[in-house]
C-alpha cells in the first residue's frame, strides 16, 4: 500500500503552531487553524492530524470549538489527541464527528483501558519518546516505560493505529527516525504512523519503501515551505489508485 500522508495542526488557543522538540515556550504561530485545515483539504488531503496542545498540558480538551468548526467547514477525516484520558472525552469527540481518537498519557497508566476502548471506538495510541523513554502530559514529564515495551502491550489488540514520535526530532526538520518507527511497528504489528522531524519530500519515497511504516505526519516541513504538499498528496493518491 502507498504511504498515507497526514498534514498536521498543533492547536494552541485556536491557532496553528509548531513547537521545537515539544517545548511550549518555543511555539511558532502560523495562523488560524481553520484556514490551514481548508488549505489542506484544497490540496487534496483526506485526513488531518490535530493535537490540542492546551488540552495535552491541562489534561482536558481545550480547543473544542475550533475543532468543531473544522469538522463543520471541511470534509476532512480528523484524528485528534491531547487531554483525552477517559471514555467520556472519547465519546465527546465521537459525537462531534472525529474519525479517530489518539490516547497517549493514559496508554502508559492503563493500557488495558485503552484496549477496552479500542473494542468500541476508533482508537490510535500515541507513543512519544525521548531517548527511548515514553513522555507524558504534553511531553512535560518522562516516564520509565520503554517505547518498545509499550508497543508490545498493544500487539493483537483492536487499536487502529500507533503514532510514534521521536520528541528530539519533532519540529527540528532533522528527518524521521526510521529505525525507531520500524521497531514500534514490528513490536506492535499495528498500522504505524511516523512522526517527528519530517524534513523534505525526499523522505517520502524512503518511508514508502519501508514495509513497516504505513503513514507519516507532516507539520513543520509544510509550514516552513520545505515540501510541496499538494504534489506529495497527489503522488501517493495516484499510487493507491494504481494498486
From Swiss-Prot:
What is the protein's given name?
1-(5-phosphoribosyl)-5-[(5-phosphoribosylamino)methylideneamino] imidazole-4-carboxamide isomerase
Signal peptide annotation: none
Q: Which GO terms describe its biological process?
A: L-histidine biosynthetic process; L-tryptophan biosynthetic process
EC no. given is 5.3.1.16
EC class (word): isomerase
- Example GO molecular function term? 1-(5-phosphoribosyl)-5-[(5-phosphoribosylamino)methylideneamino]imidazole-4-carboxamide isomerase activity
Q: What subcellular compartments does it reside in? A: Cytoplasm
Entry GO CC: cytoplasm
Q: Which UniProt keywords apply?
A: Amino-acid biosynthesis, Cytoplasm, Histidine biosynthesis, Isomerase
Query: Which residue positions are annotated as catalytic?
Result: 10, 128
Tell me the organism: Helicobacter hepaticus (strain ATCC 51449 / 3B1)
A matching Pfam family: His_biosynth
- Which domain of life does this protein belong to? Bacteria
Name the reaction it catalyses. Answer: 1-(5-phospho-beta-D-ribosyl)-5-[(5-phospho-beta-D-ribosylamino)methylideneamino]imidazole-4-carboxamide = 5-[(5-phospho-1-deoxy-D-ribulos-1-ylimino)methylamino]-1-(5-phospho-beta-D-ribosyl)imidazole-4-carboxamide
Classification via InterPro entries? Aldolase_TIM, His_biosynth, HisA_bact_arch, Isoase_HisA-like, Isoase_HisA-like_bact, RibuloseP-bd_barrel
Amino acid at each position: 500500500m502507498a504511504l498515507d500522508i497526514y498534514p498536521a495542526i498543533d492547536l494552541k488557543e485556536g491557532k496553528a503552531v509548531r513547537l521545537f522538540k515539544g517545548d511550549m515556550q518555543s511555539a511558532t504561530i502560523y495562523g488560524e487553524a481553520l484556514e490551514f485545515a481548508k488549505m489542506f483539504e484544497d490540496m487534496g488531503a483526506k485526513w488531518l492530524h490535530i493535537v490540542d496542545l492546551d488540552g495535552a498540558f491541562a489534561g482536558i480538551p481545550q480547543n473544542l470549538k475550533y475543532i468543531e468548526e473544522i469538522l463543520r467547514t471541511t470534509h476532512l477525516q480528523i484524528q485528534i489527541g491531547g487531554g483525552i484520558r477517559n471514555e467520556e472525552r472519547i465519546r465527546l469527540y465521537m459525537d462531534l464527528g472525529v474519525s479517530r481518537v489518539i490516547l497517549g498519557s493514559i496508554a502508559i497508566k492503563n493500557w488495558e483501558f485503552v484496549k477496552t476502548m479500542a473494542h468500541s471506538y476508533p482508537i490510535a495510541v500515541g507513543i512519544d519518546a525521548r531517548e527511548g523513554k515514553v513522555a507524558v502530559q504534553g511531553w512535560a514529564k518522562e516516564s520509565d516505560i520503554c517505547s518498545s515495551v509499550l508497543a508490545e502491550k498493544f500487539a493483537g489488540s483492536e487499536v487502529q493505529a500507533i503514532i510514534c514520535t521521536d520528541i528530539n526530532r519533532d519540529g527540528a526538520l532533522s528527518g524521521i527516525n526510521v529505525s525507531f518507527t520500524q521497531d514500534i511497528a514490528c513490536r506492535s504489528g499495528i498500522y504505524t504512523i511516523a512522526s517527528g522531524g519530517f524534513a523534505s519530500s525526499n523522505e517520502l519515497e524512503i518511508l514508502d519503501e519501508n514495509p513497516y511504516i504505513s503513514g507519516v505526519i507532516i507539520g513543520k516541513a509544510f509550514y516552513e515551505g520545505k515540501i510541496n504538499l499538494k504534489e506529495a498528496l497527489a503522488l501517493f493518491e495516484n499510487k493507491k489508485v494504481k494498486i
